[in-house]
Amino acid sequence: MTSSGKIRIYELSKDLGLENKDVLHAAEKLSIAAKSHSSSISDDEAKRIRGLLRQGSAANSAPPSKSEPGKTILSVKKAAPTAIKDVAPPMRKATSSSEISQVKPSAPANPTPTSPERLSRESVAHPAPPTRPVNPTTTPTSSPPKTAARPVNAPISRPATPSRPSAPTPRSANKPSSPVPPSTGSKDPRAGQTSTSSKATTVSGGGPRPKIISRPQSPAAPGRSAPPAKPSIPSDRKAPKPELVGRPKPKRPVVAPPSRPEPEGQRPDKKRPGISPRPIGGPNQRANTPQRPGAPIRQGKTRPGQPRSAGNTLELVGKPIRRDRSDAGSAGRDSNNRPGAPTRPGMPAGMRKPVAPGELMQLQKPTGRPGTPPPRRPDGTSVGTRGGSEGATPPVERPASPTAPKRPGHRPAQAPAAGAPRRPGRPDWDDSAKLEALRNKSPQKQRQKVHIIGENDDALTAETSGYAGEQQAVVLTASLARPAKPKSQKKPASKPVAALRKRKKETTRQRQRRRAMELRAAREAKQVRPEMLIVPEANLTVQELADMLSIESSEIIKSLFFKGITATVTQSLDLPTIEAVAEEFGVPVLQDDIEEAAKKTTEMIEETDLAHLIRRPPVVTVMGHVDHGKTSLLDAIRKARVAAVEAGGITQHIGAYQVEIDHGGQPRKITFLDTPGHQAFTAMRARGTKVTDIAVLVVAADDGVRPQTLEAISHARAAKVPIIVAINKTDKEGASPERVKQELSDQNLLSEEWGGDVVMVPVSAIKGENIDKLLEMILLVTEVEDLQANPDRLAKGTVIEAHLDKAKGPVATLLIQNGTLKTGDVLAAGPVLGKVRAMVDDSGARLKQAGPADAVEALGFSEVPTAGDEFEVYPDEKSARAVVGERASDARATRLAQQMASRRVSLAAMSGQASDGELKELNLILKADVQGSVEAILGSLEQLPKDEVQVRVLLSAPGEITETDVDLAAASGAVIVGFNTSMASGAKRAADATGVDVRDYDVIYKLLEDIQMAMEGLLEPELVEESLGEAEVRAVFTIGKSAVAGCYITTGKLQRNCRVRVRRAKQVVFEGDLDSLRRNKDDVKEVATGFECGIGCDRFANWEERDIIEAHKLVTKRRTLSSS
């Protein structure tokens, strides 16, 4: 099948199991243009051709019900084993839909039987020319008793006009025909063919009725031939006569199977459709007409679509029929109603009897070999026997098993030409006949073929090859078939399997087409674009972006090319470019998807806890913009002063505090989490929201809604927790709580006073106003939420913060969300294994155990755990270590990917910048007090412009600065940056010895500013044009070849060797250096405003009055980082 929905002729023939020429012939009948086997036709035309071929195949393969003219095949089998010595009367078989029967009377002149040896010599040495018989009829003859007949093929007559087979109807194949004596006469040929039972010829004399074999599919087994019957005087009895049968009128027109067009000289006369061929001796029939034998057809089942002409015939057992030389007139037609091939001189004019390959040797040599089968007579009668006794029982051949359709491997050979000369002492067959003789002798070959090809039989070759010729080949194949050996009886059953397996084998074209379809389907399935693109890092390569968008990388490269950007698949793209490309393909971009970090992914309460749940304290996260008073509000609640001791007055850690208050006469606990408000601590805020139950949003009354306020709102909504708004700083001048409510209403946070569902409480942290009301609202919302946990199980929770203490080692702040944590418990926090050695609360008091919603600091981890990881207590260390091992490998892979992403730069960009001297890198080693601070600083560094200077963080970890860090910095030329940490012993001395720059910060603002200034310091300073002044030309003085301009300084000043630009009528006519500056014939360095001077330039002398001279100089200026 071609890609345009067409099919080629050879592919259609392969599907139908036919030859190319058969399909071409069918296409010609349907007026379909097809020149050769490689021509393409449409699916509709292919369907028409298939219908035509299948219709013809069905018509030819059905059991025949009515005989047709010109298509008779008579097959005679060996007699069944009986003791009867009488001659069995031969019977003529009823014709099938594609056959016509004609029984020839025997006409030899000798009334006595002749021995086989004598006949062999006579037939070889003296072939008799064909003679014209005088109205012969058959009479009963005597023959040697109990000799089996060799299969005989009847001469086949062909009408003068082409005929189409009529629609066959089923008939009984086992019903014997009544014996009828033949006679010659002119009678309507259709009269003898209307009955469903076949009419046959008999010989006079009573005898047993011939036994009819009910399995017509297998060819007759060759046996011993009986002596031919003697001719007798024509009889005058009235009986249905064997005669040339004309063309009956078909009841229903049926399309004939496609066949090869006949040569011009062999086409029947279409103008005389009603004329039947006459026997020899008639007025319109010539004697000695050249005859051709039918083409052989392979043994066994016919192929699909092929008429089974021989397979459906009745096989008769009895005495063979003697042929007369008068058969020549009607034997000149083949089974397809075509003229036959001419016979050799001396041979009868009728169809020559096909002989087995073993008998060909006897025919070609003057004397026969002893022990070889005797040849046949030239008149068609059997000469000798194979030496069997009278009582020998011939083997009964069973029909072969159906075989799968199989295309012929070569063209079948045909009979030699009649006029071909024969050299004495030399066989006249070709090599193909020898080859086929060897094949016929092989017991493994079931499809017997005999090809007797003459030199001048090109037309016969064309007719008998392929689909059309196989219909004729059954006659020769059946006559030459030998009994199958018992070994090979089971082999035909395996042939259909082999044929089917061979047909299932894929060709190269089919395999390529299948792979192309699979690739196309996979590409179409892959092109399901995501609804939203989440960019985890600041940049992506073209290939990574193509994979995330489920498109080809070439599409992105083409899109970038149209935007003026030349990129490769390994090119790194920054966030603006990624957004532009993604929007072009209709996919929005979200960077770092901070909302995902705030979503609650793990359910802490399991099904086994449902029977043991009790109320637990709420976890409240205080969120809001920087400097809006979150920590001051917590100080007012806790009655402490944490804000006063914080560096820079801002919170840079997440803190966990537990407050116990009296509510309704009962003590109630509330756990508060204080989150940073600086923009660098987005991950900390998201972490706090992930574990919280209630979010308290602090908004300053004098500042309103700010960016981090909006971020806190999105975090709370992502975590699906209730929001309580605390409007702080109501005591300050300019405070407007109503304005804050209005701004919050724009974010779908509507106050209860305005008909919404959000609790808003105006408070003052400094004066302590409405603090009790805020706590009451928190407890009220807690009761509505119905927070519960199971304290009687092993603890589960989240790591809020972690850091490396100089004395205590790794320390983690844990929030227990379910169960009870006890000292000595073995827990796994992400990829870190720990055993609780000690626990302290927010006030520093040691604890033995901690229940749900408690926040504690735990000691005893193997290393600093990652903030935000969930921890779980295991019953023993073995199970915990197994879990940690799996997580550690995943954590290493993730950490390596992040490090590679931080230093990712495309090779093309690096080589280009290096060639221009623009490649700059700043190597950093970052040490901080807690994991959250490291996370915040790394996130801020990602936001810095990286077009001209790349920041590479070689090492980032919580803890103090060690001597190992100093050695790494010295080897890589890095700067050590510490945040709220100290230097270990020996690190300071090592840094001084190696000259490593160590910076320590306690406020994140200053740290980020210094890093940005260091990055700008790596940039080359740029030259900036600085204006000096202007002067106007008042007069021009010519001195030799040069000229001097007398000028008046209008603004600024002029300096010698400065850059000048001469403008004339707003056009620049010269730009260069000022070489000479004089005042009153003295060289001066500069001239100020309001003075006159003379100016000379070595490369310019075309001064004119009223020219404007602009003086400037180039100065270096520190470059700043550009975001583009």
UniProtKB/Swiss-Prot annotation:
SUPFAM superfamilies: Initiation factor IF2/eIF5b, domain 3 (SSF52156), P-loop containing nucleoside triphosphate hydrolases (SSF52540), Translation proteins (SSF50447). Residues 624-631 are annotated as: G1. Residues 94-104, 192-203 have a biased composition (Polar residues). GTP binds at residues 624-631, 674-678, 728-731. Residues 764-766 are annotated as: G5. Residues 235-246, 261-272, 425-439 have a biased composition (Basic and acidic residues). This is Translation initiation factor IF-2. One of the essential components for the initiation of protein synthesis. Protects formylmethionyl-tRNA from spontaneous hydrolysis and promotes its binding to the 30S ribosomal subunits. Also involved in the hydrolysis of GTP during the formation of the 70S ribosomal complex. It holds the Pfam family IF-2. The keyword Cytoplasm applies. Residues 728-731 are annotated as: G4. Residues 32-451, 480-523 are annotated as: Disordered. It is found in: Cytoplasm. Gene3D superfamilies: 1.10.10.2480, P-loop containing nucleotide triphosphate hydrolases (3.40.50.300), Translation factors (2.40.30.10), Translation initiation factor IF- 2, domain 3 (3.40.50.10050). Residues 649-653 are annotated as: G2.
